[in-house]
Structures are given as C-alpha cells and as structure tokens.
Amino acid sequence: MEKVKIGIIGGSGLYSPDFLTNPKEEKIYTPYGPPSSHVVIGEIAGRKVAFIPRHGKRHEIPPHKVNYRANIYALKELGVERLISVSAVGSLREDYKPGDFVCTDQFIDMTKGRVYTFYDGPVVAHVSMADPFCPELRELCIRSARKLGITMHEKGTYICIEGPRFSTRAESRLWRQFGADIIGMTLVPEVNLAREARMCFLNIAMVTDYDVWAEKPVTAHEVARVMAENTEKVKRLLADLIPSIPEERKCQCARALDEALI
C-alpha cells in the first residue's frame, strides 16, 4: 500500500474527487468497520493526497452516523500526517457572512452519544485539546486564502451539535452567548481522533447561511447556490495550499500522546 502524507475529508458539497489528478480508489479495512467510502488517492500539484467524503459519495450518511474512527484509522494506515477537514457551517455572527470561510481555531462540543476515542481501555488517553488545530497548517491556509482573495476569518469557535436536526431559535441564541462563531455537526469527534492519531489537523469551515438566531428567511435555492460557490472556492484553496505544505513537520502535533497515555 502506497504511503500518502496528506489527507482531506470532504464535507457537504465536497463529495467528488474531481479536484484530484490520477485518482484511484483504495479499499481499506479497519477494526472499526468500513470508512464512509473507499479512499481515493490522487495528486494536487504533484503532491499525493488521500480523500474521503465524510457523508459518502451521495451524502447518504448523516453526521451522527459517520464512522469517524474508521475514517481516521484508514487515513492513518495510508501514512497520513496532515489532515485537512472541510465543513459546511452556519454563522452565529453578523460579520461571518454566507460565502465566507473560517479557519477554525477552537471548538465547543455539544454532541452526545458518539465514540470519541481510540483508547477505550485497558490503555487510556487524555490528550490535550487546549489548541486543537495545527498552527503550521492554519498559517499556511490563511496565507493561501489571502493570496487568492478568498474571504477567510482567521479565527472562529465552531460549536458542534449532534444533529441531524438544526437548532431551535432558543438554542441558537444560547450558542451565541457561549461565544461560538459558527455551527456545524461533524467536527467532533473527528478533531480529537486526529489528535490521538498524532495528525496535524486543519478545519476549513465554509459558511452557507446564518443560523436561525438571525431570523432571516433562507431558501434552499440560496443555500445551494452558496454551497456550490464555496465548493469551487475550496478547490482553488486546496490547490494552492497543498503544494505549500513542507515535507517535514515543525509543529508539536506528532507528540500529542507523549504525556497522554495511562
């Protein structure tokens, strides 16, 4: 099995590997069951990349049913060290507008009933999540967005809810009081599993609409239009970001388990 150091998990809107050259599918078996789909290995600007659509090829897997452990394990088996997660999100702030991107730097976990760790015993891991996202990847991502003229907010707190339903207005107002900037359903447990796998993790959050706190009428047509535009923008962003990633890691992400195991 060929080794691939960079992985991409595609969210809503990013299901097809058509942004990769020389794509080929790899079927990977994991102790946690099958991943969301076969892993597609291809290239971006000459760099090998492994891609998994989080919700399956046709968005047939809801967020609370995604096999997050299998997805991360499959990418780890391929040798992935840097993982780029792409997510569609709602905005909890007036200035984070539909069509904007956010380079997430913090998260709040409001999920329930998901499987959050690879270490269910007898070995237990308590990984630090004080700074959940790789500073090296975040810096490169922000730089690429600026270069391409893509509006990207350099910081943002992502509140992850269980789904698949959306928030009530009361909940949406509460999330704003919590200090959350964007809302989605898939960041957790993806981010903590990647940390346990010693991966560098980056989340590119694409704002599709305002959450219900704003009480602004949103049509399915408008959301679909923004999502399509976001998908094309994120492909351009990935095409610029991937070749800028250095071969060797200088961050501390690979040492996440050094003092975490009991």
From Swiss-Prot:
It comes from Thermofilum pendens (strain DSM 2475 / Hrk 5). GO terms for molecular function: S-methyl-5-thioadenosine phosphorylase activity. GO terms for biological process: L-methionine salvage from methylthioadenosine; purine ribonucleoside salvage. The record marks 167, 220 as: Important for substrate specificity. The keyword Repressor does not apply. Coiled coil: none annotated. Catalyzes the reversible phosphorylation of S-methyl-5'-thioadenosine (MTA) to adenine and 5-methylthioribose-1-phosphate. Involved in the breakdown of MTA, a major by-product of polyamine biosynthesis. Responsible for the first step in the methionine salvage pathway after MTA has been generated from S-adenosylmethionine. Has broad substrate specificity with 6-aminopurine nucleosides as preferred substrates. Its EC number is 2.4.2.28. Belongs to the PNP/MTAP phosphorylase family. MTAP subfamily. InterPro entries: MTAP (IPR010044), Nucleoside_phosphorylase_d (IPR000845), Nucleoside_phosphorylase_sf (IPR035994), Purine_phosphorylase-2_CS (IPR018099). Pathway: Amino-acid biosynthesis; L-methionine biosynthesis via salvage pathway; S-methyl-5-thio-alpha-D-ribose 1-phosphate from S-methyl-5'-thioadenosine (phosphorylase route): step 1/1. Phosphate binds at residues 12, 54-55, 87-88, 186. Homohexamer. Dimer of a homotrimer. It comes from the Archaea. It is an enzyme of class 2 (transferase). This is S-methyl-5'-thioadenosine phosphorylase. Substrate binds at residues 185, 209-211.
